[in-house]
Curated annotation (Swiss-Prot):
GO biological process: one example: leucyl-tRNA aminoacylation
Residue positions binding ATP: 579
Protein name: Leucine--tRNA ligase
Molecular function as annotated in GO: aminoacyl-tRNA deacylase activity; ATP binding; leucine-tRNA ligase activity
Species name: Bacillus thuringiensis subsp. konkukian (strain 97-27)
Length: 802
């Protein structure tokens, strides 16, 4: 008979809720373990089967660690600000707050139905004013430290929608919603100076237990480059511009310069003859995103300004072009071009027939750019030097002549932090009529997002908050000075940068987190989530954590000690699950048909946790069949415990049991859940063959399966006679000596041919082995003379007889 999953799951979920089984005390006697999931955005679509994969992994670890005597922090919350809720509100006329609350309730119920051992008393919600009070507080600290500033930045402006769009919301230069044209336009934006932490964000990666591939993604994103800045005067004017280059040794080979179309000097230096062409080009670039502009494969475009720069090292005049592959937001917005030794410059020079000059020997520049090392030529005081020597000598020359200097730059840009949206945290800043700007006082936080029916974009590039006069307009009570609140809101990243800290102390109204508690719980021991957050979320969270470390709020340099990216669950056809493809599997349906324990077991058994694997109904059915086999082995049809279960030991199962405890314990700790489950299946097969089942082994097995299938675990535990939950029962241990066989199989040969196989004690002496072997082959050697007996202890006996 199989078990009734609906009955059992409802019963134990009710028990856990009523008894607050997973409440985490802030005690310090036990060692701590902090298992964190990337909290979800509560979308209207609800949970999909990809969510529980990571959640089950952290839950297995959390449940095992509790049984091993750890105080476990395993929380859940909601990353609930963001564009989809605002979009839904615009489309339906409903409030984003109501929509979000409804979605959170759906998500919470779905997550509870899967039996995760979260401490729901610690639930956080980024849209709760009691939470975002502290998001705003962190912003104030950034502002005080000079790490939050206002700048004019080119953004994606959609005139038809009257709002700024993120790069992800644009497809082929048109808005994803409605297909309207999008243009680049400079706008006043809040920026966070993450670049000030570039070196620390890079260096501290070495101390983390993260996948190397993920660390490399962060390293590449930060993109530290060492080189030099070079100053170029513009011929016939007092103007100059600066370029950064990693190859100052090739300065003698520069044959033209390129400015970003948005560069401040372009309008001033363009000649009358070139004005029309330059303006037309600048307009054409407005429609392109940074991503499109810098694509390596795209055709090179550009236009000559009519102006010339002067090469500081030899006085040569270099034509100044503008081209879209140079971005105003990257580096200095200007490059010196050395087509003979740079691939992109080579393509551009080939397209526009610009001169090339070889300054490093080793290639054939009539065919391609040579980017390798070699002796310098045509380079005056650098001739004959290799790359490293020439770079050092040129930097020395630049610094002596004040034509440039040594410089380290980063690919990392400062973080564009403002959004022209309603549904986000208000930025706590006031702009006064006299042009000054002050932060809202700490005691006035939270600055609450006002309720409004009118969340349509303002059309001016400001957020919809600009429409709410009574909220926006303020008067300084002391001076009578008039001001306007900042109308931009924070991005969705803000609330997710620090949520792991709030779980530690979720109801503290006096501080972001209690210093003693944060000392107890940090760093997070394991953080599991999807690889799509490998760069931005983790980089932003690490940045904020380091700022909080600098001001004494947190005691560790890094937030997440170990990180793991789960793979993706694909549709049965190996395609990504999506509503449009109609291949989305809803976990509610599986919980109803097969049970939460089956879903959890199946998702952990599909394959390695970091692999992307296709969903399979057959696999799901197989997982259920295994749980049914476990149930039938231990429970009779009448619901009583199996009569095979006894207090007496059973030598036949001893090795299999201890092997299983060892492998499951080690595999769980290393996140190898699929192989741990395989081992439990092997044990169940052995247990079916055994005459009796020692109760100690049954209890040990139930403890091991409970982290994966907690409802069945609890039910079997209660049938074994326990009134308390299995949650805090002690984890089974194994005996190394029991993993070794006491007896071995010995091969007996006569003249090199196998004639018998014997089982004997592994410690049998040579004499004993010889005696037993000769007895076993008595009939084979009858009438023959035994000339010699070769004994290999523990392995074989070879008898030479003729």
């Amino acid at each position: 008979m199989s078990f009734n999953h609906q009955e059992i799951e409802k019963k134990w979920q009710g028990y856990w809720e009523e008894n607050k089984t997973f409440r985490t005390p802030d005690e310090t006697e036990k060692p701590k373990f902090y298992a964190l999931d990337m909290f979800p955005y509560p979308s209207g679509a609800g949970l999909h089967v990809g969510h529980p994969e990571g959640y089950t992994a952290t839950d297995i670890l959390s449940r095992m660690k509790r049984m091993q005597g750890y105080n476990v922090l395993h929380p859940m919350g909601w990353d609930a600000f963001g564009l989809p809720a605002e979009q839904y509100a615009l489309d339906t006329g409903n409030s984003p707050a109501e929509f979000t609350e409804h979605n959170i309730n759906t998500f919470r119920n779905q997550i509870k139905s899967l039996g995760f051992s979260y401490d729901w008393d610690r639930e956080v919600n980024t849209t709760d004013p009691n939470y975002y009070k502290w998001t705003q507080w962190i912003f104030l600290k950034l502002f005080e430290k000079g790490l939050a500033y206002v700048d004019e930045v080119p953004v994606n402006w959609c005139p038809a929608l009257g709002t700024v769009l993120a790069n992800e919301e644009i497809i082929d230069g048109k808005s994803e919603r409605g297909g309207h044209p999008v243009e680049r336009r400079p706008m006043r934006q809040w920026m966070l100076k993450i670049t000030a932490y570039g070196d620390r964000l890079l260096e501290d990666l070495d101390e983390l237990d993260w996948p190397e591939s993920l660390k490399d993604m962060q390293r590449n994103w930060i993109g530290r480059s060492e080189g030099a800045e070079v100053h170029f005067n513009i011929d016939g004017t007092d103007e100059k511009f600066t370029v950064f280059t990693t190859r100052p040794d090739t300065l003698f080979g520069a044959s033209y310069c390129v400015l970003a179309p948005e560069h401040a000097l372009v309008a001033d230096i363009t000649t009358a003859e070139q004005k029309e062409a330059v303006e037309a080009y600048i307009n054409s670039v407005k429609m392109k995103s940074d991503l499109e502009r810098t694509e390596l494969a795209k055709e090179k475009t550009g236009v000559f300004t009519g102006a010339y720069a002067v090469n500081p090292v030899n006085g040569e005049k270099l034509p100044i072009w503008i081209a879209d592959y140079v971005l105003a937001t990257y580096g200095t917005g200007a490059v010196m071009a050395v087509p003979a030794h740079d691939e992109r410059d080579y393509e551009f020079a080939s397209t526009f027939n610009l001169p090339m000059k070889e300054v490093v020997k080793g290639g054939d520049i009539t065919k391609e750019a040579y980017t390798g090392d070699g002796a310098h030529v045509n380079s005056a005081f650098l001739d004959g030097l290799n790359k490293e020597e020439a770079i050092a000598k040129m930097i020395e020359w630049l610094e002596v002549t004040s034509a440039g200097n040594q410089k380290v730059t980063y690919r990392l840009r400062d973080w564009l932090f403002s959004r022209q949206r309603y549904w986000g945290e208000p930025i706590p800043v006031i702009h006064w009529e006299d042009g000054t700007m002050t932060a809202v006082k700490e005691e006035e936080l939270p600055l609450v997002l006002p309720k409004t029916e009118n969340i349509r974009p303002s059309g001016t590039g400001e957020s919809p908050l600009a429409n709410i006069d009574e909220w926006v307009n303020v008067v300084d009570p002391e001076t009578g000075k008039k001001g306007r609140r900042e109308t931009n809101t924070m991005p969705q990243w803000a609330g997710s940068c620090w949520y792991y800290l709030r779980y530690i102390d979720p109801n503290n109204s006096e501080a972001l987190v209690d210093p003693e508690k944060v000392k107890q719980w940090l760093p997070v021991d394991i953080y599991i989530g999807g690889a799509e957050h490998a760069v931005l979320h983790l980089l932003y969270a690490r940045f904020w954590h380091k700022v909080l470390y600098d001001i004494g709020v947190v005691p560790t340099k890094e937030p997440f000690q170990q990180l793991f990216n789960q793979g993706m669950i694909l549709g049965e056809n190996n395609e990504k699950m999506s509503k449009s493809k109609g291949n989305v599997v809803n976990p509610d349906d599986i919980v109803a048909s097969h049970g939460a324990d089956t879903l959890r077991l199946y998702e952990m058994f599909m394959g390695p946790l970091d692999a992307s694997i296709a969903w399979s109904e057959n696999g799901l059915d197989g997982a259920r069949r295994f749980l049914d086999r476990v149930w039938r082995l231990f429970v009779q049809d009448n619901g009583e415990l199996s009569e095979k279960i006894t207090d007496a030991p059973n030598k036949d199962l001893e090795k299999a049991y201890h092997q299983t405890v060892k492998k499951v314990t080690e595999d769980y700790a290393e996140l190898r859940f699929n192989t741990a489950i395989s081992q439990m299946m092997v044990f169940i097969n052995d247990a079916y063959k055994a005459e009796t089942l020692p109760k100690e082994y049954v209890e040990g097995f139930v403890k091991m399966i409970a982290p994966v299938a907690p409802h069945i675990g609890e039910e079997l535990w209660s049938k074994l006679g326990y009134n308390e939950t299995i949650t805090y029962a002690s984890w089974p241990t194994f005996d190394e000596s029991k993993l070794v066989e006491d007896e071995v199989e010995i091969v007996v040969q006569v003249m090199g041919k196998v004639r018998a196989k014997l089982t004997m004690s592994k410690d049998a002496s040579k004499d004993e082995m010889e005696k037993l072997a000769l007895e076993a082959i008595q009939d084979q050697i009858e009438g023959k003379t035994v000339r010699k007996v070769i004994v290999v202890p523990g392995k074989l006996v070879n008898v030479v007889a003729n």
